[in-house]
Amino acid sequence: TTGLPENWKAPVTDLNNWPRMIQIAWVLCDATGNKIETEVHIIKPDGFIIPKEASDVHGISTEKAIREGVPLIEVLNKFNAAVSKSDYIIAHNISFDEKIMGAELLRNQVQSDFESTRKLCTMKSSTDYCQVPGLYGYKWPTLSELHIKLFGADFEDAHDALVDISITEKC
C-alpha cells in the first residue's frame, strides 16, 4: 500500500483515510488445496504517488509501478472473478485487506462478492497457537512469527504480495 491509515477504526467509506493498493496477489485453490490459479499484479498509480517510506517496505517505487503496473480496474475485475469462485477468503490480517480492497472497490464503483464471502484470518486464528507475548496476554502474530512457529525459520521478502500469500497458503 501507499502507507498506513490515519485512523484504524475509520469506516471503509472514509476513502481519504485508507491507503492505496500498490500490489495484490492471490492463490485460488480447490477444496483439497490444489492450486487452480495464481495471480500477482502491481497497480499502475492513477492520481497518487508511492511515498518513499512505503516503497522502502515493499520495494515498489512510483516509477516501477508506472512502468510495470496494470490499471486497477483490470485487477479488480480479475480479483472479483476469483472471489466468485471462492467459498472462503483466507489472509493474514484480513481486516486490513478488507479495508484496503473495500476502499478500492468503492473508489472505482465496482460491485463485488468480496464483502459477503466468508473469511478466515490466519493472524487472529493462530494467536493462541503462536503464544507470542504481548502487553496484555498474547499478541497477534506477524506472518513471520507464525512461519517461525510452524517451520522453525523465517522467510525472505516479506511484504511482497506473492511471497506473503504463498507463505500464508503454506501456513
Residue ranges with predicted function:
Residues T1-W8, V12:
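Short acidic, Gly/Ser-rich segments with clustered Asp/Glu that frequently serve as metal-coordination loops
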Residues L15-N16, A65:
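A short acidic, glycine-rich active-site loop
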Residues N7, C29, E63:
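Short, electropositive, low-hydrophobicity segments enriched in small/polar residues
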Residues N17-I60, N80-C171:
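Metal-dependent phosphoesterase core characteristic of DEDDh/y 3'-5' exonuclease domains
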Residues S55-K78:
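Metal-dependent phosphoesterase signature
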